[in-house]
């Protein structure tokens, strides 16, 4: 039942009628169409003529040009033999239709309203295709052909031969378009214009009869009339021309994507350049003036009989179609010649073949034909889906900035405003009548009175702002802007009336006044008055964060890669130093913060493991070790260097006590090298570096131990007095044959159970010969080296080269760097180099680029657990019963560090200078046991049957530090983690527009984190966009070397795309050194030819002056690739300057100026 009633359903709210689409003419043709024209008959409906391949039809339209009333063929098929013909161009007048064929024939048909058409004239004299036709009047026809001639036909004579032949030159230059001027006949002169494949615009005067009829047909230029005037501006073929409806102006369009406006009258006969140029987005095929004037025409301002008024150029629109399969027609007006007024698209998006304006004085319509063989009428006054208006869709506000001190002009202008450039006529009496001609910003008096613009002064100016950056220097504004602003303020201050503007005054806020409105008023009070422009408000805005000088310094000095022998931490410190040198303190702290976070991330992932702290229990609670420390004074004198130094180095080593033989199993080599570096001289460091090599340690292991005393450095005795304690320590280290130091390196590289010397010593004082000892040591040794290699490969650069250790280096005055030698860092096998890559405060801080007092982790939140275990076990917790009375220095090298590591630890009471303050601490007879951190693990014992696998060994086998693991690490949840800090730094730099900082971070950290960087911080496309913009900016600032380095150091995943983007063709353009105009020299090119020796760019056609000659030989610098410019401004040939600077080894400029080559 429901389904049967559904057919009776209807919309109770009524039907919504669809929006009616405007009616327009669309006529499809079964033949291929190439051209069209209009038959103008007064008092009758318009008639459109279509021509093409085997097609010549006449269409009669209705009054509003929306429908075809009648359709007929002009060619009578009954009388005309059936043969192929192709119509290439059409022109109509009165009742005559002239068509140019592809075989060079011109046929003229006479049409009637009754449909009786006949062939009236058949003109055959062209050798090639006819490209253009035009009627001078009803009896004179002009035709232009591909054979390079323009022929004039007199239809009254019925002669098949032309009465006159015109040619651009004596050689064949194909004619693309020609037209007779209707404005010159008033003075009894007939003018014909033509454009050619050479890009030339030729003007012919038909009154000159020299050579007319002589040698006709003998050649293109034989007996032909040459042009009266010839202009050449197009760089390629000129394809179309059209004369203005009211004045002696002509449009020319060419393949060079330019539309030129020329004045071909007597007043403009001496001009060498077009009046106006419109740049289009495609090669121009056809160009046409509109026959209907604009709705708001510009009134004439000049009344001269021989010069047309330029205002008529703005009263008419013009349209153009494009070559190369473009499906649009662009409509322009010289009021806004940079943006099309309308863009008409073909309905089927097929390329436009030809178009004409409708011959009407009321409607602005276009007839167009496309390669779809469809005739379409477009009404520009109605809204059509195929017509777009870019001016209506454009935003009303547009801004453009230049980095640094930007001189900004705020323009307030309506879309229909235009500039005529007319002289000023001010008739009002002022006290400045004698300087009225000097008013450069004045405008002509408008038809009606309008209030003048009075610029108000402000209390807050940009000049009152002081730059926050000391490197920014005050740059003056442009003199014209400054002078106009100051003089305008001076006039308004005196109460003088300014010349009235062309439009009503613009509302201005006080903040829109210029920079010089107050500060420059007094200085220019006696200057000539100038009226400000009613359209432009000029001001200067300083941008400290985008200063050119700072940009150049940062771009050139920032390290975008890790140099050989340095680490990423060192690069962060060096970049921080560069940022601080230009007062970019925020960037400086960002670099420091990233370096500290990078170090902490490494330490947490490498050492923050509870199993490492458990290795110290068996050493502190062993009774044999406790009793061994109470032997004699000589035993106590040989305590570890770390205990002797206090907490200065021991805190960094994290395992330093008097009973653990200074150093843990995971950083033993580094710890030994650190102590040697602190007390050894430069000569001794080279020997010690050899002693700690892996090869020598392995050799000593194979030879065995000579005595138990050599195994345990605590058994080494010294007989020096207390007053020579420091010297005794240094002398003990200076002995090259001291085996205790060699064995200490061995002990630290062995497992923890072997460093428990009480378990390895027997009652007779000898070391038990256990085969498992050497096996265990050899099994451990490669794993330790592997761990060091993994860390080094992760933190340092991929390539490593030897550094000259003899090179002089500067060091800072802190206690730590004063004791370090650069040779230790330069040693390729030194473990200290590994430590130098882990911490900026422990590595090469002594270099000249290091930043003193660089702090990190000031509140000790992220102190590794191994450090806390070392402090607890070494007796530095404080208290009267501490077994070591020496007070250590602070954990950090920063003198502002906190006195305590955390709330539950005792503070260290002395500074870094108190290495030995109380010798009685060495003789304490009782050692307090270390606090129980983890359950004791018995790794090896003599009583056990088989040795157990060390937990440290298991950890080192599995522990491999990699930054890619940070993506899933819990440390990323911390706001101060490296990933979070890097993300914030990159995003902030990107949002602030700081290209240097953003791109430097990308170049340094992208390959380090790879997937983390792309997934979390910036995608690869965003990174590529930033780097490409950075490269373009560097090239724009002439920093080409830096731009090349950025491309070379780009991340591996972006290097290829960035290199392809950066490798673009470079267009070199030279400007005149005198008039500063572009060296085009088209006049000389047309006169001498492009391959002539007289043509070049060592002179300027605009100012007729020669450019600077070679400073060495005095000859002109001909060519574009042989000129080498110096910084002093002189130039010369490449060979001449090579001979002067390279062969003769001269350093000064050949011109004798004070310039000296670096």
Curated annotation (Swiss-Prot):
- The segments annotated as RING-type zinc fingers are 1110-1153
Q: Where is the composition biased (Basic and acidic residues)?
A: 425-452, 610-621, 681-702, 735-746
Ranges for region Disordered = 421-529, 610-637, 678-808, 837-909
Q: Which UniProt keywords are listed?
A: Metal-binding, Repeat, Vacuole, WD repeat, Zinc, Zinc-finger
Q: Where are the WD repeats?
A: 80-119, 125-163, 170-214, 233-272, 293-342
MF terms in GO? zinc ion binding
Spell out the family assignment given in the record's similarity comment: Belongs to the WD repeat RTC1 family.
Q: Where in the cell is it found?
A: Vacuole
The family database entries (Gene3D superfamilies) matched by this protein are listed as: YVTN repeat-like/Quinoprotein amine dehydrogenase
How is this protein annotated for GO cellular component?
cytosol; GATOR2 complex; vacuolar membrane
Q: Name one GO biological process term.
A: positive regulation of macroautophagy
Report the InterPro entries cross-referenced here: WD40/YVTN_repeat-like_dom_sf (IPR015943), WD40_repeat_CS (IPR019775), WD40_repeat_dom_sf (IPR036322), WD40_rpt (IPR001680), WDR24 (IPR037590), Znf_RING (IPR001841)
Query: What is the superkingdom listed in this entry's lineage?
Result: Eukaryota
Q: Which residues form a coiled coil?
A: none
User: What is the official name of this protein in its record?
Assistant: Restriction of telomere capping protein 1
What spans are recorded as compositionally biased (Low complexity)?
505-526, 890-909
| Biased composition, class Polar residues, residue ranges | 455-471, 750-765, 784-800, 840-855
Transmembrane segments in this chain: where?
Answer: none
The task this protein performs is described as:
May be involved in a process influencing telomere capping.
Signal peptide as annotated in the record: none
SUPFAM superfamilies, alphabetized: WD40 repeat-like
């Amino acid at each position: 039942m429901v389904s049967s009633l559904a057919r009776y359903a209807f919309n109770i709210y009524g039907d919504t009628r669809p929006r009616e689409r405007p009616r327009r003419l669309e006529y499809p043709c079964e033949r291929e169409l190439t051209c069209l024209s209009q038959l103008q008959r007064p008092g009758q409906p318009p008639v459109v003529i279509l021509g093409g391949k085997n097609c010549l039809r006449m269409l009669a339209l209705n009054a509003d040009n929306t429908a075809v009333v009648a359709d007929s063929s002009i060619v009578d098929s009954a009388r005309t033999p059936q043969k192929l013909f192709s119509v290439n161009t059409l022109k109509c007048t009165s009742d005559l239709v002239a068509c140019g064929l592809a075989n060079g024939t011109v046929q003229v048909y006479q049409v009637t309203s009754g449909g009786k058409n006949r062939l009236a004239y058949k003109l055959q004299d062209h050798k090639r295709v006819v490209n253009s036709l035009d009627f001078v009047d009803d009896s004179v026809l002009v035709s232009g052909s591909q054979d390079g001639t323009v022929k004039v036909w007199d239809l009254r004579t019925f002669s098949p031969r032309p009465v006159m032949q015109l040619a651009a030159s004596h050689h064949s230059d194909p004619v693309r378009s020609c037209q007779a001027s209707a404005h010159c006949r008033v003075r009894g002169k007939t003018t014909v214009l033509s454009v050619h494949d050479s890009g030339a615009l030729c003007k012919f005067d038909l009154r000159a009869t020299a050579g007319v009829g002589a040698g006709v047909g003998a050649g293109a230029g034989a007996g032909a009339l040459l042009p009266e005037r010839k202009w050449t501006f197009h760089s390629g073929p000129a394809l179309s021309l059209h004369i203005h409806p009211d004045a002696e102006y002509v449009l020319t369009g060419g393949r060079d994507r330019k539309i030129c406006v020329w004045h071909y009258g007597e007043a403009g006969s001496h001009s060498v350049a077009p009046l106006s140029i419109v740049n289009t987005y495609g090669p121009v095929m056809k160009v046409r003036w509109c026959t209907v004037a604009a709705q708001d025409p510009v009134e004439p301002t000049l009344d001269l009989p021989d010069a047309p008024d330029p205002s008529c150029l703005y009263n008419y629109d013009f349209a153009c179609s494009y070559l190369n399969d473009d499906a649009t027609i662009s409509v322009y007006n010289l009021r806004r010649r940079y943006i099309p007024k309308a863009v008409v698209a073909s309905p089927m998006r097929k390329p436009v073949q030809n178009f004409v304006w409708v011959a009407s004085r009321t409607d602005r319509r276009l007839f167009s034909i496309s390669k779809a063989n469809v005739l379409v009428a477009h009404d520009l006054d109605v809204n059509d889906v195929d017509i777009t208006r870019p001016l209506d869709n454009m935003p009303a506000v547009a801004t453009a900035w230049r980095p640094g001190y930007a001189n900004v002009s705020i323009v307030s202008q309506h879309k229909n405003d235009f500039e005529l450039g007319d002289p000023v006529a001010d008739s009002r009496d002022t006290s400045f009548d004698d300087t009225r001609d000097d008013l450069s910003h004045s405008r002509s008096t408008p038809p009606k009175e309008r209030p003048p613009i009075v610029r108000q002064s402000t209390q807050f100016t940009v000049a009152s702002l002081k730059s926050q950056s000391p490197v920014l220097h005050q740059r003056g504004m442009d003199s014209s802007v400054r002078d106009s602003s100051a003089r305008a303020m001076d006039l308004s201050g005196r109460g003088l009336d300014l010349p009235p503007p062309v439009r009503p005054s613009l509302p201005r806020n006080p903040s829109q006044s210029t920079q010089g409105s107050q500060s420059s008023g007094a200085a220019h009070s006696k200057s000539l008055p100038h009226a400000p422009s009613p359209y432009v408000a000029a001001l200067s805005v300083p941008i400290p964060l985008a200063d050119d000088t700072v940009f150049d310094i940062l771009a050139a000095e920032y390290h975008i890669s890790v140099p050989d022998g340095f680490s990423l931490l060192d690069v962060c410190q060096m970049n921080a130093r560069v940022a601080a040198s230009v007062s970019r303190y925020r960037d400086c702290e960002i670099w420091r913060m990233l370096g500290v976070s990078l170090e902490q991330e490494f330490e947490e992932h490498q050492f923050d493991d509870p199993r490492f702290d458990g290795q110290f229990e068996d050493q502190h609670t062993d009774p044999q070790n406790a009793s061994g420390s109470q032997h004699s004074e000589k035993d106590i004198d040989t305590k570890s260097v770390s205990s002797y130094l206090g907490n200065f180095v021991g805190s960094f080593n994290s395992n330093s006590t008097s009973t653990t033989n200074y150093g843990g199993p995971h950083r033993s080599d580094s710890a030994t090298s650190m102590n040697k570096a602190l007390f050894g001289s430069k000569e001794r460091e080279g020997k010690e570096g050899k002693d700690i090599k892996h090869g020598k340690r392995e050799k000593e292991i194979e030879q065995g131990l000579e005595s138990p005393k050599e195994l345990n450095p605590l058994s080494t005795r010294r007989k020096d007095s207390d007053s020579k304690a420091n010297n005794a320590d240094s002398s003990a280290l200076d002995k090259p044959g001291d085996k205790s130091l060699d064995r200490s390196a061995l002990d630290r590289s062995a497992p923890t159970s072997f460093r428990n010397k009480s378990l390895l010593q027997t009652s007779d004082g000898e070391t038990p010969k256990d085969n498992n000892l050497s096996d265990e040591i050899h099994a451990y040794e490669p794993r330790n080296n592997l761990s060091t290699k993994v860390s080094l490969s992760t933190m340092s650069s991929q390539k490593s080269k030897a550094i000259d250790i003899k090179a002089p280096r500067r060091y800072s005055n802190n206690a730590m760097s004063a004791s370090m030698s650069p040779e230790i860092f330069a040693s390729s096998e030194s473990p200290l180099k590994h430590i130098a890559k882990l911490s900026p405060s422990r590595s090469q801080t002594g270099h000249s680029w290091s930043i003193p007092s660089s702090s990190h982790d000031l509140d000790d939140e992220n102190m590794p657990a191994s450090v806390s275990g070392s402090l607890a076990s070494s007796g530095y917790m404080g208290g009267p019963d501490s077994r070591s009375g020496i007070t250590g220095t602070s954990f950090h090298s920063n003198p502002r560090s906190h006195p305590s590591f955390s709330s539950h630890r005792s503070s260290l009471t002395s500074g870094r200078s108190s290495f030995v303050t109380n010798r009685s601490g060495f003789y304490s007879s009782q050692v307090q046991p270390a606090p129980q951190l983890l359950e004791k693990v018995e790794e090896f014992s003599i009583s056990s049957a088989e040795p157990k696998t060390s937990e440290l060994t298991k950890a080192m086998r599995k522990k491999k530090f990699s930054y890619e693991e940070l993506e899933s690490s819990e440390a990323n949840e911390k706001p101060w983690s490296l990933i979070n800090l890097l993300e914030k730094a990159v995003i902030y730099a990107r949002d602030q527009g700081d290209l240097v900082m953003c791109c430097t971070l990308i170049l340094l950290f992208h390959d380090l984190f790879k997937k983390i960087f792309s997934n979390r911080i910036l995608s690869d496309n965003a990174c590529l966009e930033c780097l490409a913009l950075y490269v373009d900016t560097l090239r724009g600032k002439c920093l080409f070397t830096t731009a090349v380095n950025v491309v070379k150091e780009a991340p591996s995943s972006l290097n290829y795309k960035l290199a392809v983007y950066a490798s673009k063709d470079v267009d070199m353009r030279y400007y005149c050194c005198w008039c500063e105009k572009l060296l085009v020299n088209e006049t000389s090119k047309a006169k001498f030819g492009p391959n002539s020796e007289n043509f070049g760019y060592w002179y300027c056609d605009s100012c007729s002056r020669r450019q600077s000659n070679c400073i060495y030989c005095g000859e002109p610098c001909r060519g574009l690739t042989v000129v080498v410019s110096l910084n002093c401004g002189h130039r010369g040939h490449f060979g001449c300057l090579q001979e002067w600077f390279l062969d003769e080894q001269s350093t000064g400029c050949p011109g004798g100026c004070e310039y000296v080559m670096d």
